[in-house]
């Protein structure tokens, strides 16, 4: 009888990526097939996130539900992974002794051995270590699930922002070798993937080892990925302003595969608050990056992250954040009220902004960004947009849905053979969270680019300095 696996995932796209890898891994090693119903499962995995408030209590609440399933099925294996597990491993083991396996983001590749240990009679297994980049060497080959795919290029973060737990839960920055990244993407392209999203806590800090002992920068990696035949769209998330260097901006100038949409977290518009957050940049420096980007990509849309009510944030500080939002004209945001994360420096700061004030500031901020997003959407009315068709629409299964380069969802009437391909759609209606349109051109009528070798793409902008060292410019 086929054994079943249920995974519940909270948090960022890195967690979603990790969960998909866990599913692929356990299918290949134990024949475990995914199920949406936890009561059907032989193995239950909870992939946790510590970003949101009361993350630990949310974990124990979920585990309490699964405890009843364990009572009815003593052979059920329960595992907790992700950032809360990394932070609170021993606490979880003591408070929820019925949990069999506790693993961190960097040890998910060891799940098969852990499950075998539990089934062999061991009472519990805890492994929340940071074994560098080992996990990527132990995962099965990538499996495409549609025309878009996420690919992790690095793990961890060295920035140690005062509010953030990531360096403590995922470790410091470690980049995957460039050949490994390119090979994974090439495999996905062969399976029909047309758009790839490069993932990392701080992707623009990527410094990938090459086969000849050199280091590949993030800008160089972007050009190499763009050269892979079949990959027509390239995204990345998330990045840090202090490492958004000019060579990355140059890629926007000369690489059309890189989309005109960027998520670049700023967190606040007040230099005083940014200093307390240890962000290592000013609001002016952030605006300078955006100005340079728009000089080479006038149509680029920018999204960001904001934390309101950080300890010590005054009404004037918040007003400076609102000014930055207006000046940059953000298209969307992920915005949160501040709440302390145990073990972070900010947790020791006096949390002197009232909850009511935090909520009010969040409402004002989100309303402003929603207004700006609505203006962008209205400007798209009557325009033609290139859409990558992802599948049937959630609103109407008789229609298709896809995304524009600027990450707008578009629903339209079309035929099944369009799925996985590009279509040009004329926008006819604008809604709060989506657009509607009519197909005016199919992929066969577009004349998309001809295949180029990686070296041809790199040579487009390669120049040598006075020492004969290659540099890449627009």
UniProtKB/Swiss-Prot annotation:
PANTHER family: CDK5 REGULATORY SUBUNIT-ASSOCIATED PROTEIN 1 (PTHR43020), MITOCHONDRIAL TRNA METHYLTHIOTRANSFERASE CDK5RAP1 (PTHR43020:SF2). It comes from Haemophilus influenzae (strain ATCC 51907 / DSM 11121 / KW20 / Rd). HAMAP family: tRNA_metthiotr_MiaB. It is found in: Cytoplasm. This is tRNA-2-methylthio-N(6)-dimethylallyladenosine synthase. GO terms for molecular function: 4 iron, 4 sulfur cluster binding; metal ion binding; N6-isopentenyladenosine methylthiotransferase activity. One of its GO terms (cellular component) is cytosol. Monomer. Pfam families: Radical_SAM, TRAM, UPF0004. Its cofactor is [4Fe-4S] cluster. Residues 143-375 form the Radical SAM core domain. Belongs to the methylthiotransferase family. MiaB subfamily. Keywords: 4Fe-4S, Cytoplasm, Iron, Iron-sulfur, Metal-binding, S-adenosyl-L-methionine, Transferase, tRNA processing. Binds 2 [4Fe-4S] clusters. One cluster is coordinated with 3 cysteines and an exchangeable S-adenosyl-L-methionine. The keyword Cytoplasm applies. [4Fe-4S] cluster 2 binds at residues 157, 161, 164. Its EC number is 2.8.4.3. The keyword tRNA processing applies. The gene is miaB. SUPFAM superfamilies: Radical SAM enzymes (SSF102114). Residues 378-441 form the TRAM domain. [4Fe-4S] cluster 1 binds at residues 12, 49, 83.
